[in-house]
Amino acid sequence: MSLYALLLIALGMSMDAFAVALAKGAAVRMPPRKIAATALVFGTVEALTPLAGWVGGFYAKPFISEWDHWAAFVLLGGLGLKMMHEGLSGEAEDARENKRESWWLTVLTAFGTSIDSMIVGVGLAFMEVNIAFAAAIIGMATTVLVAVGLTVGRALGVLFGRRAEFAGGLVLIAIGTWTLLSHLGLIG
C-alpha cells in the first residue's frame, strides 16, 4: 500500500476523534498542557486499535484470501457509510463534558472513537501493508488532529464536527472502492 493511501486512511480514521475534539474544545477550555496530553491519549489508543484488528485479521487470512479485497471493500465501505450517517444525523460523539473531566473518561472516549480503527486493522491484514508503520501514521495523525480540534474548537464550537465525520466516511469509502477496483484489475 502506498504512503498516500496510508495517509488517507489515517486522515479518515482521525475524523471521529477530530469531531469529538472540536466539540470538547468548544465545551471545555483546556490549557495547552492538557490539550497535548489529551491528544497523546487519543493518538496512542488510535494507534493500538488497528494493531489489535490486524492481528485478528492476519490469523483469519488463510481462510479468506480468495475474497480479501471484498472484505476490505465491505469493511471500509460499511464503516465509511456509518461515519457519513453519523455526520448527517448528528449522532456523532457529543463531548460536552464538565470542566473536571477525568482521565478515565478521556481514555474511554478515545476507545469509543477508535473502535473503527480496529475494523480498519482487520481490513489492513488483507493488504500489503507494514502494520506498525500504518498504526504509527494513524496515531500521529490522530494526535495532531485532536490537538488542532481542541484548539480550534474553543473558537469555532462544533460547527465543523458533523462535516468532519462525513468527510472521514467519504475517505474510507474511497479507499475501500480503490482497493476493490485495483484487485479486480479495473484501475492501476
Swiss-Prot record:
Location(s) in or outside the cell: Cell inner membrane
Transmembrane region(s): 3-23, 35-55, 70-90, 104-126, 140-160, 167-187
Keyword Cell membrane appears in the UniProt entry: yes
Pfam family, one: Mntp
Highest taxon, organism lineage: Bacteria
Keyword terms, alphabetized: Cell inner membrane, Cell membrane, Ion transport, Manganese, Membrane, Transmembrane, Transmembrane helix, Transport
Major localisation: membrane
One example GO MF annotation: manganese ion transmembrane transporter activity
GO cellular component terms attached to this protein's record: plasma membrane
Bilayer topology term: Multi-pass membrane protein
Keyword Transmembrane in record: yes
InterPro entries according to UniProt: Mntp/YtaF, Put_MntP
Purpose: Probably functions as a manganese efflux pump.
Family that this chain belongs to: Belongs to the MntP (TC 9.B.29) family.
PANTHER family in the cross-refs: MANGANESE EFFLUX PUMP MNTP-RELATED
Stated name of the protein: Putative manganese efflux pump MntP
